[in-house]
Structure formats: structure tokens, C-alpha cells
Amino acid sequence: MNWQQRIVCDPKILAGKPTIKGTRISVELILGWFSSGWTTEQVLESYPNITRDDILAAFAYAQELLHDDGILPMAEAAA
């Protein structure tokens, strides 16, 4: 998945957060829907201006971000 064709950052839209090109739907919002239990079908029905490929691009963007350097500090696991 080539997310670069679908995910953009524009300082004039949502303060520069990564969004689906041509929308105000952020990668953060898409990830939030899925972490809340939404299905792909629910997202597509609720937001017909995005596509399945847009959703996959959001996940690809997040995966690449985490792969490169997106680790949040966490408490150590108890032994």
C-alpha cells in the first residue's frame, strides 16, 4: 500500500494532522474508530467519501510511523 498517494498533511487542515486526501478525516480518527470496535463496513457506510484503500492507507501510514520511531514511553512490565 502506497499511503503517500492518499495521506496528506496540510497546516490549514486539522492543524497539519495527517488526513485522507481531499477530506478532513484524520488518520487518528480512523484508528480511533477501529480501536472502538467499528468494522470497515461501518466506516464506509458512515463516511461514503472515503474508500477501503483510504482506510488501508491510514493503517500503512501508522505502521510506518511506528516502524521508524513512533514508540511512546511506557512503564516497565512487572516481573
Give residue spans per PLM region:
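Basic, low-complexity segments
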Residues: 1-17
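C-terminal structural segments of small proteins and small subunits
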Residues: 52-76
